[in-house]
Amino acid sequence: MKVGTDGVLLGAWAQGGRRILDIGSGTGLISLMMAQRFPEAEVVGIDMDADACGQARENVMASPFRNRVEIECCRLQDFGGAGVSKTAEALETAEALETAEGLKAAGVFDAIVSNPPFFVDSLKNPDSKRTMARHTDSLPFRDLFAGVKRLLSDDGIFSAIVPVEVVEQFVAESCILGFYLIRKCGVKTVERKQPKRFMLSFAKHRISPYEEHVETMMDSQGNRSEWYRKITEEFYL
């Protein structure tokens, strides 16, 4: 699986925290980008593809962030957060959640990111691994938001990137599970085109002001736009 534009965009844009979960981490790109952007963060990446997890672990071990990034091979539906049964409500004091250790003890994350499977009704690719990575059969949107609701701290932020074809369905599923859309960024490839993908941030509570804007990746000369260059400057040589 190659490094994709969607992963680069989300890894450069998403809000971070002290304990970050990357759902569908693939080869570890977004996990590593979040670790680089947030030097104090502990990052956990989960994916159900064993080969992708193996490659992600190799990439993590070759990075400067090996002590802060962990890769687990499992489905979101089976992931326990910290391998413990405690919940945030079971902690004796709210102050315990003010550190990465407190979040881990509670089995929750204050930032979750995902570049989720997005093909809903299209024909499946004969390459089973590519199908798994791209088709919602492996992680329906309802299951994704249910998992995020279980694992996100009360004040945490969930960020995702989805193509324009499914953005309305994605937001609708978030509402059903009680989330509020707090930030929306449409991304055009070039100025004359309509947005092909949307980056979205959700919270468990309404947050003001709501942010919505559209950005362009490439300028008229085919170079990275000022916006794209700015958000990715620490990742590109």
Q: What do these predicted ranges mean?
A:
Residues 1-16:
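S-adenosyl-L-methionine
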Residues 3, 138-195:
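Conserved Class I SAM-dependent methyltransferase catalytic core
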Residues 10, 115, 144, 202:
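Residue-level signal for inorganic ion chemistry
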Residues 12-84, 102-126:
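Conserved SAM/SAH cofactor-binding pocket of Class I
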Residues 87-100:
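Long, intrinsically disordered low-complexity tandem-repeat segments
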Residues 116-143, 147:
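Mobile active-site "lid"/loop adjacent to the S-adenosyl-L-methionine
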Residues 192-237:
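SAM/dcSAM-binding transferase cores
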